[in-house]
Regions:
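Active-site core segments that coordinate phosphate-bearing ligands/cofactors
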Residues: 2-10, 14, 20-55, 60, ...
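Short beta-strand to alpha-helix junction loop
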Residues: 70, 95-102
């Protein structure tokens, strides 16, 4: 069942997936699940409070793990598994869709004109590729913050038989394919704290991270075959 879900949605079965969380909620708190009228992410909730509409963009919908990555419709198998009905979810719109006409209270609270346009956009990973110009199928974007990810934009869904990659629909015949890593910059922080000689840093009066970067720069690509699994 998991392989079929992944093949349909492009989202690996993982605790971070909203589909997985909804399934847990259904099993652990069935009464709460039964009382819920709608299920929303932060963005669709904000648009509801600002404009009175219940919508989100296709990329966020794809990230739920319940959107069929090929057809762009809600996946029947995923919905049946969670017990969620399509009408309980936000309407899926293009990321370039604009909302104009803020509710009076919202416009007043933000002190902006009610006709200020708001655009739905996309999830952060897709927009990071756009931001660095990695929107061609032969260009890869690597993002390293606290966590990390490698992503490429394609013109068709890419499904990995081993479920190592995610594949999210973005918009207008584009998909983002990649792999996440829960450790990125924090691994560098850990390495500096545990591997850099504190006395050397103190004696040289230099920043520990600068010292680490100097050492790293002297090591050839591939680090002589060293593998590190954070």
């Amino acid at each position: 069942a998991g392989q079929q879900l992944y093949a349909s949605t492009g989202t690996p079965i993982h605790p971070m997936s909203p589909l997985t969380k909804l399934l847990w909620l259904k099993q652990a708190h069935p009464d709460l699940m039964a009382r819920a009228s709608y299920f929303a992410d932060i963005k669709s909730y904000l648009f509801y409070k600002l404009f009175g509409v219940f919508r989100f963009d296709v990329s966020i919908a794809s990230c739920t793990g319940m959107l069929n990555v090929t057809t762009g419709d809600w996946d029947e198998r995923a919905l049946a598994l969670t017990g969620v009905q399509p009408e309980q979810l936000p309407e899926v719109v293009s990321g370039t869709t604009q909302e104009i006409g803020l509710l009076p209270d919202a416009a007043s609270a933000m002190s902006i004109p009610a006709q200020t346009p708001f655009v739905y956009g996309a999830f952060d990973g897709a927009l990071s590729n756009l931001g660095v110009g990695a929107i061609e199928k032969d260009t890869v974007a690597i993002t390293i913050g606290t966590s990390a990810a490698v992503r490429v934009v394609t013109d068709h869904p890419v499904i990995d038989p081993k479920q190592r990659l995610f594949c999210y629909a973005v918009d207008n015949g584009l998909w983002v394919v990649g792999g996440p890593l829960n450790n990125g910059g924090d691994v560098f922080q850990w390495a500096v704290e545990h591997l850099v000689d504190a006395s050397a840093v103190q004696n040289e009066q230099i920043d520990a991270y600068e010292l680490a970067n100097d050492v790293i720069a002297s090591i050839p690509a591939g680090a002589h075959g060293l593998l590190f699994h954070p």
